[in-house]
């Protein structure tokens, strides 16, 4: 027997669960929303509050100040902020050049420029908030194995914990950059390889970071260090994202710890004293992957399935959250006017509202690394003057920070 659901979200990662929370809060109570995830989801916890389990090697995500505003609007920020590391200052520099700039949260009357959160804590907090909300049906482990667009909706077939056939008014595809469902629907992707790899790890320094995030551009590629909460024993931790040529990344993934620390020290310098430890190292190839279509009648492609970005500016997840916020508002307005949620004009309205934000964020993340890696001496001087000039031109610096923090986008019409 075929069941009906107004909205089906395919993908229960951080974007999918955030989307479920947003829609659960903004759509009428009679709206049936399903979340389908291929891996087993955590079970509800008594009291609804997850426990924080610190780990030196925990992977992390940088949330912009704009993302904080979105999570506050969803009502989940109070839970999240128990175990976050605020970014009070951002230091941007260019190795071997004189240009640099400092950005301070206090200059903008913000509590922080952003926050670094461990993925395990973020995921646990969001899923428990979804259980407490009680508006979304979770189907896990299960997978959408067939999706056929029909008049008025999408016919879905699920396999896994619950084998089901569902007629969905709206299908939201949020199953990641390598989305199998996107491919199954015949939505093409545009991929641009950067011919670089990202090396990620957590590192320990002798000195505390004092809430400062570092973005250091080098001729090999950018080095980003994000402040993390201290590990057990008070170890001063930072999350490293190091962009490198594939062969260089491969070597540094496998080399002895002492050699790795020496190489990173030479690239980053001694702003945090001597490097003392590196945790588990991981690497992956970098590419800009964009869905050629984000909306069709009855379908929206979201998160990394829609646009997977270069990590240099940490904008991918924050852009996805802004997409979530705007889609929630557009669908709420459609429901209020009794317009079908999957109507193509409704979905085009969402895409039109987000297009400028998406284009600007993608272009910023795409062009920035190449700009700082080019060795042309005239261009190098212009880069130096540009970084130094941000400190000399407060209005330009404020606008730059507003966009980097995701605040400019969400204060425009159509945003939270």
Where are these regions (language model features)?
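Conserved Rossmann-like nucleotide-cofactor binding loop
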Residues: 15, 41, 178
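Conserved FAD-binding catalytic core of PHBH/FMO-like flavoproteins
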Residues: 71, 162-165, 170-274, 278-281
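Conserved N-terminal helical subregion
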Residues: 80-184, 192-197
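FAD/FMN-dependent oxidoreductases across multiple families
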Residues: 248-342
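C-terminal helical "tail/cap" subdomain of flavin- and related membrane-associated enzymes
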Residues: 329-416
